[in-house]
Regions:
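Pre-Walker A (P-loop) beta-loop-beta motif of ABC nucleotide-binding domains
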Residues: 22-33, 87
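The feature captures the beta-strand-to-loop junction immediately N-terminal to the Walker
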Residues: 35-37
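ABC ATPase nucleotide-binding domain helices that frame the ATP-binding cleft
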Residues: 43-46, 142
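Helix-to-loop junction immediately C-terminal to a conserved catalytic motif
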Residues: 50
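Conserved ABC transporter NBD signature motif
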Residues: 58-66
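ABC ATPase nucleotide-binding domains
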Residues: 75-78, 83-221
């Protein structure tokens, strides 16, 4: 786990500036939300942090390490999207443990970590079910567990609750916040939903037209 620092980040696509001179300190262990309308630069900022795209100028640090130009697989990030992207042919347990298998953890360590995460997301009874046999909210919890199975420096979430109905979305806001707090992990969350940002965040970054308009606590925004 580490904090994240963006220093004078610019991302341009030809003559279009998607992110314009953004500087931001994300504190270690905090839940920070990037809030704004479509096209404001919030998802581009998240993708810059992840390493999926590179800045036109500026630098990105995880803790004291400059990760600018480093590929996503070498940044030790966890990613959760609106599309859960669970493997349909793998059980819940196998989905959670997939990254650990890829990293050649031994079987005992994989089982121990998967069991810990099943308890954390309260899905022990669904361990042997397939994605088609669980609900959307359960699938999203599995996606989060998979993202943090190998402890990441930072957990990045791109509108992960957007496909859920309102009641389930509100429940999952509480669940995601609980999971993040229990793990003590640094989390960056993207949404256009102001109520969602207010309910979940330690701090909110309001973005518009590629710039940061305001940063503050939910009470201060």
């Amino acid at each position: 786990m580490s904090g994240v620092r963006l220093d004078k980040i610019v991302k341009s696509y030809g003559s279009t500036v998607a992110v314009n001179d953004v500087s931001l300190d994300i504190r270690e262990g905090e839940f920070l939300t990037l809030l704004g309308p479509s096209g404001c630069g919030k998802t581009t900022t998240l993708r810059l942090i992840s390493g999926f795209i590179q800045p036109t100028s500026g630098a990105i640090h995880f803790g004291n390490k400059d990760v600018t130009g480093i590929a996503p697989q070498h940044r030790q990030i966890g990613m959760v999207f609106q599309d859960y992207a669970l493997f349909p042919h793998l059980t819940v347990s196998e989905n959670i443990g997939f990254g650990l298998v890829e990293r050649r953890y031994d079987k005992a360590a994989i089982k121990k970590r998967v069991d810990e995460l099943l308890a954390l997301i309260k899905l022990e009874e669904a361990a042997d079910r397939y994605p088609s046999e669980i609900s959307g909210g359960q699938a999203q919890r599995v996606a989060v567990a998979r993202a943090v199975a190998h402890p990441p420096s930072v957990l990045l979430m791109d509108e992960p609750l957007g496909a859920l109905d309102l009641k389930l979305r509100e429940t999952m806001q509480t669940e995601l916040r609980r999971i993040q707090q229990e793990l003590g992990i640094t989390a960056v969350y993207v949404t256009h939903d102001q109520a969602e940002a207010m309910n979940m965040s330690d701090r909110i970054v309001v973005m518009n037209a590629g710039i940061i308009e305001q940063i503050g606590s939910p009470k201060g925004i």
